[in-house]
Each structure stands twice: as C-alpha cells, then as structure tokens.
Amino acid sequence: VTCDLLSLQIKGIAINDSACAAHCLAMRRKGGSCKQGVCVCRN
C-alpha cells in the first residue's frame, strides 16, 4: 500500500520508498524499499 499510495518522485527522491522504509522500521526491520510497487522490508 505504501508504494502505490505515495508513488511520488521529487528531484530523483522517491517519497514512496521513504514511506516504505518507515513502515518497515515500525515493524522492527532494518528499513525497506519499493520493488515493482511492493514494499519489501530488509531483515
């Protein structure tokens, strides 16, 4: 949801990746990024 909902890019910075990373951090993961519209958290 975070990747599709916030698919915005400003000066090369993807806002959706920041939202995805925050989502993953909230789940006690080490961050994450969007891959083909899906938020993928790092372990």
From Swiss-Prot:
Predominant cellular place of this UniProt entry's protein: secreted
Domain of life: Eukaryota
Biological process, per Gene Ontology: defense response to bacterium; humoral immune response; innate immune response
Tissue specificity remark: Hemolymph.
PROSITE patterns: INVERT_DEFENSINS (PS51378)
Subcellular location: Secreted
Transmembrane region(s): none
Disulfide bonds: 3-34, 20-39, 24-41
GO CC terms: extracellular space
Gene3D superfamilies: Knottin, scorpion toxin-like (3.30.30.10)
Name this protein carries in UniProt: Holotricin-1
Organism the protein comes from: Holotrichia diomphalia
